Amino acid sequence: MKVTIYTDGAARGNPDGPGGYGTILSYIDSTGVEHIREYSGGYKKTTNNRMELMAAIVGLEALTKPCVVTLYSDSQYVVKAFNEHWLDGWIKKGWKRGKNEPVKNVDLWKRLLAAKNQHDVTFCWVKGHDGHPQNERCDVLATTAADGGNLADDNVVE
């Protein structure tokens, strides 16, 4: 099945403020009917990058069988990690980057890799806040979650 996932993350007072993610999952079933699911959640203290990662994770983890996925994100951090093979280098170096510095958000990168490996995923960058309807909707989901009262603890903030 072909699935399209749109994602966005937001953080207020980055890096130690509340944050949220928004994800839209869209597919057309065998009868030609389009299905759209929206997901969002918020955390008390987090970063924008962690929320961008969570948005992608939630979208991929929502899939119950292997799919061909096109995932759109306005996060160059997420998209370039795959498309420019940053992740390959980080893994080869034992989750180190550049001058032997530890990679941030390793817990979420590992979770995203595990979710991605179940599918054939293409990561595509979309310019944020540029009128792309699904990206704008994900932004609303993410910021609403960040501003909400039901925020979870993000136990790893780097």
Swiss-Prot record:
Task: Name the UniProt key words of this record, in alphabetical order.
Answer: Cytoplasm, Endonuclease, Hydrolase, Magnesium, Metal-binding, Nuclease
Q: What class of enzyme is it?
A: hydrolase
The membrane spanning regions, by residue number, are none
Identify which cofactors the protein needs according to its UniProt entry.
Mg(2+)
Q: Which Pfam families does the UniProt entry name for this protein? A: RNase_H (PF00075)
Q: Which reaction does it catalyse?
A: Endonucleolytic cleavage to 5'-phosphomonoester
Residues the record lists as binding Mg(2+) 1: D8, E52, D74
Q: Which residues form the RNase H type-1 domain?
A: 1-147
Q: Any idea which positions bind Mg(2+) 2?
A: D8, D139
* Comment on bound cofactor: Binds 1 Mg(2+) ion per subunit. May bind a second metal ion at a regulatory site, or after substrate binding.
| Segments forming a coiled coil | none
A GO biological-process term = DNA replication, removal of RNA primer
> What domain of life does the UniProt record list for this protein's source?
Bacteria
Q: What is its EC number?
A: 3.1.26.4
Q: Where in the cell is it found?
A: Cytoplasm
Q: Which GO terms describe its cellular component?
A: cytoplasm
Instruction: Name a GO molecular-function annotation.
Output: nucleic acid binding
State how it assembles: Monomer.
Q: Which family does it belong to?
A: Belongs to the RNase H family.
Classification via NCBIfam families = PRK00203.1
Q: What does this protein do?
A: Endonuclease that specifically degrades the RNA of RNA-DNA hybrids.
User: By what name is this protein known?
Assistant: Ribonuclease H
Organism per entry: Lachnoclostridium phytofermentans (strain ATCC 700394 / DSM 18823 / ISDg) (Clostridium phytofermentans)
What is this organism's lineage?
Answer: Bacteria, Bacillati, Bacillota, Clostridia, Lachnospirales
